[in-house]
């Protein structure tokens, strides 16, 4: 398979309702400086913020980039690809990211919850895309891998608070019942 036939993502942005960064990941050198990245984010936000992308993802073409986006509560999700990329693949990346975040945040997809769980969101991005190449779009697989990594990193049950231990036990029980 040639590199040209592989769909590439240029960036994934998670912005708040004012266009400020919550979590962003760039996979392209199209924006070489931090100032260029911030300018792009502001531009994308200003062009899309007036649309109603709450129920379904919307697609737009801005500066030779296809941008697929969706809003939830006070968060705005964006996936950017080149003008020749397949919109359906970009939309599936967006939906996979959105649904995985919703699973990890227990359907409480809002800015404060996202900021409190920023590590999970970045792990989610790492599981989905590597150097622009789409690895996974299934939200259950993504959330499962992230949850597995976060429980491994959290250490033993004695180091966790009681509520964290109960949540971990509940997740392990649910996983064992499903398999």
Curated annotation (Swiss-Prot):
Biological process terms in GO annotation: intra-Golgi vesicle-mediated transport; intracellular protein transport; retrograde vesicle-mediated transport, Golgi to endoplasmic reticulum
One protein family per Pfam: Clat_adaptor_s
Domain of life where this protein originates: Eukaryota
CDD domains reported for this sequence: Zeta-COP
Keywords on record: Cytoplasm, Cytoplasmic vesicle, ER-Golgi transport, Golgi apparatus, Membrane, Protein transport, Transport
Location of the protein in the cell: Cytoplasm; Golgi apparatus membrane; Cytoplasmic vesicle, COPI-coated vesicle membrane
Protein family: Belongs to the adaptor complexes small subunit family.
The protein, known as: Coatomer subunit zeta-2
Taxonomic lineage from the root: Eukaryota, Viridiplantae, Streptophyta, Embryophyta, Tracheophyta
């Amino acid at each position: 398979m040639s590199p040209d036939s592989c769909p590439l993502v240029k960036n994934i942005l998670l912005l708040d309702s004012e266009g400020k960064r919550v979590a962003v990941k760039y996979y392209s050198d199209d924006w070489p400086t931090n100032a260029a990245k911030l300018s792009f984010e502001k531009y994308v936000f200003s062009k899309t913020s007036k649309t109603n992308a709450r129920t379904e993802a919307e697609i737009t073409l801005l500066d030779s980039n296809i941008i697929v986006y969706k809003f939830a509560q006070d968060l705005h999700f964006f996936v950017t690809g080149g003008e020749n990329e397949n919109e359906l693949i970009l939309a599936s990346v967006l939906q996979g990211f959105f649904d995985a975040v919703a699973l990890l945040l227990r359907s409480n997809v809002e800015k404060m919850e996202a900021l409190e769980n920023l590590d999970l969101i970045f792990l989610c991005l790492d599981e989905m895309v590597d150097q622009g190449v789409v690895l996974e779009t299934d939200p259950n697989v993504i959330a499962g891998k992230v949850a597995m990594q976060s429980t491994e990193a959290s250490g033993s049950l004695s180091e966790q608070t009681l509520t964290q231990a109960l949540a971990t036990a509940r997740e392990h029980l649910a996983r064992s019942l499903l398999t």
